[in-house]
């Protein structure tokens, strides 16, 4: 019984401490430095749901199953030569494909290096330039997977004088003045690994949510969620935290990694941060939210009593002829009742323990009485034995007294008879014989 009580107490203590210790899963400190994109204060009422937004279109996973990064380069020209302004696509090339030259006129006349996506040299070569080639050229690099777009603009002017041929920077773009009929090279070099390398996709794209309770520095933050583009999802901490704080399943499909915290409590206050890492695309962003929980506005308990006479039958699903009682309890009350429930449950447990303890002590004391009674009983037996002895004695005594009442001679006779019966007779005979003589 005593052991059971101890066990119960231990269990109670363990339950309370587990809540504290399971919560402190450390966040990975080895994250590369992220750019803090935003710091926001968010306050929400207790019991409500808070949404901490964290969205980035660049984190959308395009599931490039071809293992081709969907990198593409295209050269366009903005020309005013024919009087009207027009934009024309000259050529393009995919990272895992051949280059396409759009007009037949340019076929064989303009070209890009075939190894552009391994070398990072996307420069355009135009042979036999004509006056009609004048215009603003743009080298466009698109990385569909990383949602990156880069453009380099170069202005090409044609001159008929060899002396006038030159290259300069006009403050916005490079300007090349080329001699008519010559071969020009419009430079577009980008050796950033994003444009030249291949990586394994899934491991490179990860989203973390961290939480710092008030007063805890960022390097000791608790990790809440890790989410990988491959679909792997890791949640940390006790189950109630995992159920309470979650991000949607479609996060990588929509680029929405917003954290939803349901049933806000005061204990949920703290600093939350969303880390978006796209290692391949070089994206490292951090969004910070300070969450404050405010007391809900005190609602008055509303008891709405409506008799069936006055109740308007708007909803056909509602059963008619019943009194409708709407009882609205403010959420703070619900919280209060929860707390009360906890307190009562704990109290009940202690009462049970107390009863057990009282029971044990009572049992012990009872055992003590029995022991004493047994001793008494033994003594009684002794006393009985003694009384038996004394009665015997009195019997003897009363006999003696009876003997005293009798004649002394008789007594003597009796004594003599008792001690020497045969001899007495002999002596008597002898005495009589002597007397008769
Ligand atoms: C957020 O709240 C903190 C503490 O109350 C305050 O110091 C800070 O100025 C607030 N920041 C913003 C952006 O409101
Ligand atoms: C890029 O390629 C063009 C054409 O092949 C070449 O003329 C140029 O030197 C290259 N540039 C670099 C920086 O390698
Ligand atoms: C979090 O949300 C996802 C998708 O909505 C769900 O599959 C998962 O079970 C949730 N996690 C917990 C611990 O409730
Ligand atoms: C009471 O309930 C009725 C319908 O059930 C509604 O029309 C009315 O507005 C309610 N009154 C209050 C004070 O909530």
From Swiss-Prot:
Stretches in topological domain Extracellular: 23-339
Keywords per UniProt: Cell adhesion, Cell membrane, Disulfide bond, Glycoprotein, Immunoglobulin domain, Membrane, Repeat, Signal, Transmembrane, Transmembrane helix
Transmembrane regions: 340-360
Disulfide pairings: 54-139, 188-274
A Gene Ontology BP annotation from the UniProt entry: cell differentiation
PROSITE patterns: IG_LIKE
Compartments where located: Cell membrane
Glycosylation-annotated residues: 41, 121, 246, 304
Side of membrane Cytoplasmic, spans: 361-437
Main location: membrane
GO cellular component, one term: plasma membrane
Signal peptide: 1-22
Classification via InterPro entries: Ig-like_dom (IPR007110), Ig-like_dom_sf (IPR036179), Ig-like_fold (IPR013783), Ig_sub (IPR003599), Ig_V-set (IPR013106), MXRA8 (IPR042472)
Domain Ig-like V-type: 32-159, 167-294
Membrane-topology descriptor: Single-pass type I membrane protein
Keyword Mitochondrion attributed: no
Function according to Swiss-Prot or TrEMBL: Transmembrane protein which can modulate activity of various signaling pathways, probably via binding to integrin ITGAV:ITGB3. Mediates heterophilic cell-cell interactions in vitro.
Subunit structure, as described in the record: Homodimer in cis. Does not appear to form trans-homodimers.
The protein's name in its UniProt record: Matrix remodeling-associated protein 8
Record gene name: MXRA8
